[in-house]
Amino acid sequence: MATKTYGQMCPIARSLDVLGERWTILVIRELLLGPKRFKHLLAALPAIGTNRLADRLRGLEDAGIARKAVLPPPATVPVYELTADGERLRDPLLALGLWGLDLPLDDRVDPGTARADLIALCLTATQTEPVDPGRRESFEFRVGDDVFHLQLRHGRFLARSGPSPTDPTLTVACDLQTFMELALRQLTASQALKDRRVTILHGTRTSLAEVFRVLAYTPPTRSAGEEGEAVRGAGGIRC
């Protein structure tokens, strides 16, 4: 928890007392993708440093947002994971991420930090089409060196790091730019397949089309005046 406080009864201020320290929300962002070992959190957030990461994790534990756990066999390694209270941050933080999509990029933003799994994480907040809550499936994506999967549980998609632990309905491979264009509806699944920018390793074209029909970002409608003032981040999502 932050050592400084706004000292206000306002629930937004009290939330920031817990979440307002630099890096805290990004640590939570990584845990939204599933349980993580300390070294994997450090690799995902290289600029945070070992001591600061340990401090932020202690703060999240003290606040009841994250906890230590051990992965089941055969892994049986210590990890950090979100608690039920931590999971309650999923919707508000992903809504914040979607809001951030419309912020202009500047020279301080490193395009090399774009990650497909974080794009997918943001995409899960765009689901508007209902899906049968009885379906339990996974969809695996291999985007460059990044491997992640989308779980379909209780009618909702969740993005998770790494390969699917169960046999996926769909496994596809593509590059980061292609995935970005699919996510932003700048490219259709059928066109990506036609242009050989996507390879289906397992599954069907129908499954691929479904993912990007149910999950895809549509920019907000702007008036002519607003469009002139707003500068879209060129090239796609930077999560």
Language model feature labels by segment:
Residues 165-239:
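C-terminal interaction segments
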Residues 53-63:
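Basic amphipathic alpha-helical segments that dock to polyanions
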Residues 10-49:
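N-terminal helix-turn-helix DNA-binding core of bacterial DNA-binding proteins
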Residues 1-8:
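N-terminal intrinsically disordered/low-complexity leader segments
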Residues 91-140, 147, 222, 226:
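Amphipathic alpha-helical dimerization/coiled-coil segments
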Residues 20, 72-95:
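Basic, amphipathic "hinge/linker" alpha-helix immediately C-terminal to the N-terminal HTH DNA-binding motif
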